[in-house]
Amino acid sequence: MKIKVGFGYDVHQLKEGRPMWLGGIQLEYTKGPDGHSDADVLIHAICDAILGAANMRDIGFHFANTDDRWKGVDSKVLLKEVCRMIREKGWEISNVDASLALEMPKINPHIERMQTALSEAMSIPVEDISIKATTNEKLGYVGREEGVNAYAVALLIKP
């Protein structure tokens, strides 16, 4: 059996009037991440962690922000495709552990819905997906509510 770990990171600027997509669900808030797709930083970090563990480059390589096919796309579509790609190479996802850094909105009330959305997109059990959130204690661009960061680790196994 082969076991590999991958790390992913993403950041997006927050803009007034943009929808707030995080973890595959839309949250009510006055700002949202700005980007080429729906700018779901959590899913993008998870995609990079999975791709990294499989040594398959990164999300920008496979879904370039210069390609209009991905403009405005639901990031769950990207995650499903990443999972298909790694499974085609014989990998399975053991678990994903992710953290969000943002001041608002509060994430804890939404974690179970995020886990469900991600579980469906990745075809893995909810209990294999951990999501945590923290603030930046009002420090830096995250603390000023100008941006949101996401970090993720994925463990892949190849029987």
From Swiss-Prot:
Species this protein is from: Cytophaga hutchinsonii (strain ATCC 33406 / DSM 1761 / CIP 103989 / NBRC 15051 / NCIMB 9469 / D465)
A molecular-function term among this protein's GO annotations: metal ion binding
UniProt KW keywords: Isoprene biosynthesis, Lyase, Metal-binding
Site (Transition state stabilizer): H36, T135
Comment on bound cofactor: Binds 1 divalent metal cation per subunit.
EC top class, as a word: lyase
Protein name listed in UniProt: 2-C-methyl-D-erythritol 2,4-cyclodiphosphate synthase
Function: Involved in the biosynthesis of isopentenyl diphosphate (IPP) and dimethylallyl diphosphate (DMAPP), two major building blocks of isoprenoid compounds. Catalyzes the conversion of 4-diphosphocytidyl-2-C-methyl-D-erythritol 2-phosphate (CDP-ME2P) to 2-C-methyl-D-erythritol 2,4-cyclodiphosphate (ME-CPP) with a corresponding release of cytidine 5-monophosphate (CMP).
Quaternary structure, from the entry: Homotrimer.
